[in-house]
Amino acid sequence: MHLGSLTISRFRSCDNVTVSLRPDLTVLVGENNGGKSNVVDAIRLLTLPLSGRRERYPEDEDVRRHATVSNFQIEGVFRELGDTLKGLLISAVPDPSKNEAVFGYRYESRSERAPRGKTTVWAGRFDTNEPEAGSTDLIRHVYLPPLRDAHQALGTGSGTRVMALLRHFLPKDQEQDFLAGVRRADARPDTLTTMNTEIGNALGMLTNGVRPQTAALDFGAETLLDVARDLRFRMADSGLLPEDIRASGLGYSNLLYMATVVVELAKAKDADLTIFLVEEPEAHLHPQLQVLVLEFLLDQARQSADRAIEAGKPEGRIQIVATTHSPNLTAWVSPMHLVVMRSRRRDQNGVAVSESISVPIAELGLKPKTLDKISRYLDVTRSALLFGNRAILVEGIAEALLLPVLAQRLVLAGDADGWLRFKGTVIVPIEGVDFRPYVEVLLRPHGGARIADRLIVITDADPTVLGNRKIDLENLAATHGAPQALTVLTNQHTLEHEIFDAGNEAFLKSVFLRLHRNSRRDWTARIEGVAVQDRPDAFLKLIEAKKTRKGDLAQAIASRVAAGDPFVVPPYLADAIRGAAQA
């Protein structure tokens, strides 16, 4: 069994969104305020924590601000139920011919009729159908919050995390034996005895004339919480003596905190399904550790799926749902595991509102060849392709190097808001001319939603190549109902040719001679010695003859533009920059 889909209505940023989830691992990616954490919180409300101690409760503030009714609703569809589970969850199975169960959760805001708010849980086809007693206990969750300071979480005297571990490992009937084992010695040191004597004498002089008092300084009766507050985590590199947690870096301290939560998964065998919710596991971790964390989580899910189910015992399945802002993590997993969460603006009764939308890559209907190409690209480049709602696709690294400096220094100079919008645009060098897979994944719709609102493609016209790349891509966007979302800008030849032809001969001469200091005669003979209209072509031949790499030339151009040298931006590049900077 696994949570197959989650429909969230009127909950925070989610007006009415359905999020599809994979049986083993789902990674929620996308921009800030896209709704990733709200999906996690919805699962926390719908299901019970594995520990039995609920930490997330509904609040009036959870109801979406622009909702027409003062409640929110969460509905989960659980799939791949076996015959035994269908029997145990019979009240939650709306259609006996399908191996699915439905559980729902509704919260109504506080009112005169319900001064504390009203929570309703239902199962099956109708939201008036109460779950059978004990059925919700079969589905649990473990929550790992985003860690900003593991030193604080592990090293303070509150003992919260240690207490959770003690409760996990210590049976209730063994608690007193444990406390006896860690209790302080009955004998008190001489210093403490002397202190008590002196305090008693002083107190006696103050109270003997009225009502004599006695006092003693001693240890309090120890409870399990007292022990938890006294215990401290220590850690060091393997082979060294563990030190106080604050001597370790935040990254490894975060991993230690994760380890203290992961051990709770051992109890997953007591539930049929445990959903492990992990928010931003990449915090303070370098890329290799990020990958190891996600690999470990995926292994937990797969091992639970491979485990043989014993008759009469829970299935013990583990399902992972993680959120991330890390391109490293999205690159490591298959795109099939990725669900893009993003915000979309729309008009509601004359008021502009934003809402979360969900785009599961696995359900876009992409061909395997397209998915493979996207997967390989993300794996190699660690690109932020899926993290923004506007993107510029370019052929190679040269355009990607030049666009930011041209935007900041020239095209958008003086337009602070436009520059910020441009900075929020993802620039994707695909190192080729096959833009189709990237346009497909960014513009193909799912339930009326798509990853990108604005997509700009910059490419060469390539007159020697059959077909028209611009028309082909525009037709593709129209097929997906997004002709307004795509802009294809082409030059007449190549990037270097267009830069020269825009009126940058003197600029390129300076740059070329910086790269090839002993080639002044070559420039004079091969560029200045030909007709003006032929010089752009001659420049291409010269840099090819000198084996000038496109990336090196682009770096040199960007450096001089940044230094303030006069430069004319080719019109098609200026159009691309302005298009990305539009509000």
Where are these regions (language model features)?
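Switch/communication elements of ASCE P-loop NTPase nucleotide-binding domains
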Residues: 1-28, 33-48, 234-381, 567-568, ...
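Acidic, divalent-metal-binding catalytic cores of TOPRIM
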Residues: 315, 333-583
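Flexible phosphate/Mg2+-sensing switch loops adjacent to catalytic phosphate-binding sites
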Residues: 48-71, 271, 303-316, 348-349, ...
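Extended helical coiled-coil dimerization/tether regions that scaffold
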Residues: 153-156, 163-278, 299, 305-307
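Conserved nucleotide-binding/hydrolysis micro-motifs of P-loop NTPases
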Residues: 78-84, 111-112, 148-151, 239, ...
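Conserved P-loop NTP-binding catalytic core
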Residues: 40-97
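Mixed-charge intrinsically disordered linker/loop segments at interdomain junctions
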Residues: 96-148
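Coupling/switch segment of ABC-type P-loop NTPase heads
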Residues: 129-202, 206, 236, 478-481, ...
